[in-house]
């Protein structure tokens, strides 16, 4: 579309077609490749902007997930992790860098995510998930993405999402194999 009549005219057309006057010109430019997709469009981009995703774990799985959520324009991302960045994390936990070694992973993650997209909100929770805090953590989010690295946390998050009626996306990795499942209430 942009080759035929220019991106500026496309953006104006997209704005009119989807009634998404809430998107600014810079936002339309930032998300233009998503807006071009019929499955997303301007309305879908507005939904992403209003979405709230809680990311449990800012390590090997949470790192790429967080990067893509921020780049896609998810409006609010919550990061939950009680760990700090270690040098041994850096080859697989791409949310972090040498400069953030020793920093809480949630703070390192926030720094990276807001550098990618300064328009999003990143809430940080430097804590481990437990029976006392899981339900309060979930309450303000639409979707929970579990990238934790142990079964007890996974079971707890699954149970909490069930009782709180939250959509759960659960991912795990072992060596070169991965699994992903989505559970809707």
Please provide the spans of the model-predicted regions:
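Adenine nucleotide-associated cytosolic modules
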Residues: 2, 6-7, 20-185
């Amino acid at each position: 579309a942009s080759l035929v009549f220019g991106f500026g005219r496309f953006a104006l057309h997209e704005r009119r077609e989807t009634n998404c006057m809430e998107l600014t010109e810079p936002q339309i430019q930032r998300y233009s490749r998503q807006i071009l997709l019929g499955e997303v469009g301007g309305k879908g981009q507005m939904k992403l902007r209003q979405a709230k995703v809680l990311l449990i774990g800012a390590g090997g799985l949470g790192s790429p997930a967080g990067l893509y959520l921020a780049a896609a324009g998810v409006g609010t991302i919550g990061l939950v992790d009680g760990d700090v960045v270690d040098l041994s994390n850096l080859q697989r936990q791409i949310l972090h860098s040498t400069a953030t070694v020793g920093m809480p992973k949630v703070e390192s993650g926030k720094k990276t995510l807001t550098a990618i997209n300064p328009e999003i909100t990143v809430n940080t929770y430097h804590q481990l998930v437990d029976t006392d805090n899981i339900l309060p953590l979930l309450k303000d989010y639409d979707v929970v993405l579990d990238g934790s690295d142990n079964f007890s946390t996974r079971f707890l998050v699954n149970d909490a999402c069930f009782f709180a009626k939250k959509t759960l996306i659960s991912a795990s990795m072992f060596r070169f194999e991965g699994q992903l499942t989505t559970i809707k209430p």
